[in-house]
Every structure is written in structure tokens, then in C-alpha cells.
């Protein structure tokens, strides 16, 4: 059990969880508001 908690508190697992969470937020935002992420610069 101690090894499992050490693995779950390691940096790569936290980075992957954060990236997955951020990607999910971006995907859902893009699903509801598809035009807001791609503003023309003109």
C-alpha cells in the first residue's frame, strides 16, 4: 500500500492527470462554443 501511495503522489502521474483534465475542459468548451477558440486576428 505504501508503494501505491508513493506512485500516486509522483510528478508524472500528477502531470498526466492535469493534462487529461485540461484536455477534457478544452474539448467540452470547444463542443459547446466551437468558434471562440479560433478568433481571426484581423
Curated annotation (Swiss-Prot):
It is found in: Cellular thylakoid membrane. InterPro entries: PSI_PsaJ (IPR002615), PSI_PsaJ_sf (IPR036062). Coiled coil: none annotated. GO terms for cellular component: photosystem I; plasma membrane-derived thylakoid membrane. Keywords: Membrane, Photosynthesis, Photosystem I, Thylakoid, Transmembrane, Transmembrane helix. It is a single-pass membrane protein. PANTHER family: PHOTOSYSTEM I REACTION CENTER SUBUNIT IX, PTHR36082. May help in the organization of the PsaE and PsaF subunits. Belongs to the PsaJ family. This is Photosystem I reaction center subunit IX. It comes from Microcystis aeruginosa (strain NIES-843 / IAM M-2473). The gene is psaJ.
Amino acid at each position: 500500500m505504501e508503494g501505491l501511495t508513493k506512485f500516486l503522489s509522483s510528478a508524472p502521474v500528477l502531470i498526466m492527470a492535469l493534462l487529461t483534465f485540461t484536455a477534457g475542459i478544452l474539448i467540452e468548451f470547444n463542443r459547446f462554443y466551437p468558434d471562440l477558440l479560433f478568433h481571426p486576428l484581423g
